């Protein structure tokens, strides 16, 4: 090992200790497996309908009184923007639909019947893709399609299991006391899913919504019915009570971001913790799913939690909760959701990591997707925001680009010229990225250029430090604007989808084929295989080289004790020559492992370094020591090559 390399590693370690004012707190140990994770995010209602017998019913909807009686399960393979008859009847609850609006209410009352059996049926698909960790959006009992409005956190949604009617009867009399809780058919099927996932080497993360509930949550139902006499009166933030002596009185309460469908759990008087009632309930739910005991026997539990709206709960609560989690499972992974600078939040609250919007997704959008910030700024943003975290946290950060809360990656790219940037250079993300807020938003299928940029993003994501996240369907070629269009039914090889030929704005549009794209899948699979085959991509250090703002090029060195890899990027729309040279680079017999383009470019010696001739909009991965056969170049995204 070169002395200069040792010095560089030492500098990184010292920087991690010295960052910020005063000594940095010791970071919670992220489990080793999290550094090697390739995450796959599943939005359960839209992933796969494996058991049509458990499909949701009209009465199971969020507000069935406002939904026409001829409501029915939506056709999985239909044109997403084509409205069913019952949707056209629904406008502003009870008024007839005189001006059809796709985004009024109907689309949010659609149900497609995605369930746990559908996930079980597709575990082999996930394994073949190469991912090794699943992140589930909420799967607990709730009325909405997104299920962030929990009716119960101790039970899987009955309509995701094999016996909805039986489960609903079984759990009807339960309260916050775990002694009253049963293991429903849906619960047991989820435990089976966990065991089957583990058998395939897949870890399981579930969405924990500990900030708010739905109005059907047992405690809130009792509160609404019994008012100040309710045993749960201290569980929520009530702002006014009903007064039998005053007909004008109203029952009001704090809802998450003002939404009355999402009543917020109360905090302690000093605002430093969750109120005792909901706090204990969260503790009990946490234990139930991390360390389940079924019929007197221990069962395999989940491997961790993704925490919704985590930065809206007090640090004291999360610190204690994270410590409790690790008493149940020292290898559990806890990931807080935040869109803000997150290093202090992660460390102070004791999380393993966070959803890495600020330190990864934002810079990636600014440079690779939108092409609006220079290469040097891209590198400096990634460096400064990454290095704000403790070194032990960085490899476990969830490096996502899109999610259920954004437009899809492919559509971000299609609409890259619509992106807005603040005067201070801040990168827009999750703003006006849909038809409702931006009538010029393009809902069409990505063209060849957009797919080329998608390949760049994916290959960089798979080679950068931190655990990459694939949002369901991206690997199959799916596109879509912000919610609800980012939650279309998953396209599968065995299903034939109708063309997307309807425009929600009533405009004429071309007919786009949304069916499973084998070339897109092949590229994702190759990029994931590259990451899984080279541990340096998961745990090696990062150093950016040769940023050229004029040419739109940049290189990144990933290095460890046994292997060096260089990722060369050409974001420009013209071919470029990139020279790779650095004192830390200790290459012998270098080779090109993978390209986001159609062919592997030649690597040639140039003085003390190496030269690559990169086509436009291309990322290439090289390494120095030949110890295994290179990953084969995948077909370009969007090609017609068979999978």
Role assignments for model-derived ranges:
Residues 194-202, 211-212, 220-227, 285, ...:
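Active-site-proximal helices and loops of the catalytic beta/alpha 8
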